[in-house]
UniProtKB/Swiss-Prot annotation:
Phylogenetic lineage: Bacteria, Pseudomonadati, Thermodesulfobacteriota, Desulfovibrionia, Desulfovibrionales
Binding site for S-adenosyl-L-methionine: 44-46, 64, 91, 112, 119
Record HAMAP family: 16SrRNA_methyltr_H (MF_01007)
This protein's name: Ribosomal RNA small subunit methyltransferase H
Native source species: Nitratidesulfovibrio vulgaris (strain ATCC 29579 / DSM 644 / CCUG 34227 / NCIMB 8303 / VKM B-1760 / Hildenborough) (Desulfovibrio vulgaris)
Protein function: Specifically methylates the N4 position of cytidine in position 1402 (C1402) of 16S rRNA.
Keyword field contains Cytoplasm: yes
Subcellular location as annotated: Cytoplasm
Cited InterPro entries: RsmH (IPR002903), SAM-dep_MeTrfase_MraW_recog (IPR023397), SAM-dependent_MTases_sf (IPR029063)
SUPFAM superfamilies reported for this sequence: Putative methyltransferase TM0872, insert domain, S-adenosyl-L-methionine-dependent methyltransferases
Pfam families (alphabetical): Methyltransf_5 (PF01795)
Length: 323
């Protein structure tokens, strides 16, 4: 659990704009005296708003695998020091934190999946091709896997499959081949090196008509592979329902179609009643719905929010309530 340092200054987090903030508060519906889990604390924009909305007596367990994010979040949450319990953990490891606190259940849980604005904006973290930095992409700098190892050590077939699966990149084969050919003349060490290789792998007519930089999907794919982002989500969803109190709410914000698909299918599965085969004339399984889905379709940012925060453009929120 982290301490609350007093040498942190507000500018490190004051400009942070949490995505879909009003929608999170609406669907999480925090109440006084409740216990809440923020599995992806980031710079604590959502967490601080939850605590402000709920008032005294509310407690929040916050997790982040990135120690720098946790350091900054700790400063932002200093006014709520008696109400917060912060851990350097992956969100899939949330049960370790709840068990440490002696919390059998929580009244609400939030995860905001994907890379944070802070991580993108710090070139030395190696997430972005907008500024040069080491080819890293680890959300936890102490983790073993890195983008450098994938790019410089994996076979063509492995790179192709990663870029195709996680990036849904139609040029995955060409890009993987270009990476392997380039590293034959020396290691690929920086983000701009990799971005240039990917850009050259694209046919000129594709580059001329593309809305985004040609490296966008490849960088996304490598980041998701390095941090096992889909595996994290699956493991979290496997465990969270049992740790929600009756009436407890789960709110998930995702930025990628693969993640949103996983969340949608899992919530629909939880909301099913009878699971008997269709040919059985009468229910014999006795299964009843475990959740009530609160969002029939994903909630997205309003035009007003998009004007303030363009990075919210791909955010999708889904929510469910345990019955």
């Amino acid at each position: 659990m982290s301490e609350h340092p007093e040498n942190m200054t507000a500018p490190e987090w004051a400009a942070h704009i949490p995505v879909l903030l009003e929608e999170v508060l609406e669907y999480l519906a925090p109440r006084k005296g409740g216990r809440y889990l923020d599995g992806t604390l980031g710079l604590a924009g959502h967490a601080s708003a939850v605590l402000e909305r709920a008032g005294e007596g509310t407690e929040l367990c916050g997790l982040d695998r990135d120690p720098e994010a946790l350091r900054r979040a700790t400063a932002r949450l200093a006014p709520f020091a008696g109400q917060t319990h912060l851990y350097h953990l992956r969100y899939s490891e949330f049960e370790e934190a709840l068990d440490d606190l002696g919390w059998p259940t929580v009244d609400g849980a939030l995860i905001d999946i994907g890379v944070s604005s802070m991580q993108i904006d710090l070139a030395e973290r190696g997430f972005s091709f907008h500024a040069d930095g080491p080819l890293d992409m680890r959300m936890d700098p102490d983790a073993h896997e890195s983008a450098w190892r994938l790019v410089n050590r994996e076979r063509h077939e492995v790179l192709r499959d990663i870029i195709a699966r996680y990036g849904e990149e139609p040029m995955a084969g060409r890009i993987a081949r270009a990476i392997v050919d380039a590293r034959n003349t020396g290691s690929i060490d920086t983000t701009l090196q990799l971005a240039a290789i990917v850009e050259r792998a694209y046919p000129a007519k594709w580059r001329a008509t593309a809305r985004n930089h040609p490296a966008t999907r490849t960088f996304q794919a490598l980041r998701m592979a390095v941090n096992d982002e889909l595996g994290e989500l699956e493991r979290f969803l496997d465990a969270i329902l049992a740790r929600l109190a009756p009436g407890g709410r789960l709110v998930v914000i995702s930025f990628h179609s693969l993640e949103d698909r996983i969340v949608k299918h899992r919530m629909r599965h939880w909301a099913e009643g009878c699971r008997c085969p269709r040919h059985v004339p009468r229910c014999v399984c006795g299964h009843s719905p475990e959740v009530r889905i609160l969002t029939k379709r994903p909630v997205t940012a309003t035009d007003g929010e998009l004007a303030r925060n363009p990075r919210a453009s791909s955010a999708k929120l889904r929510a469910a309530e345990k019955v």
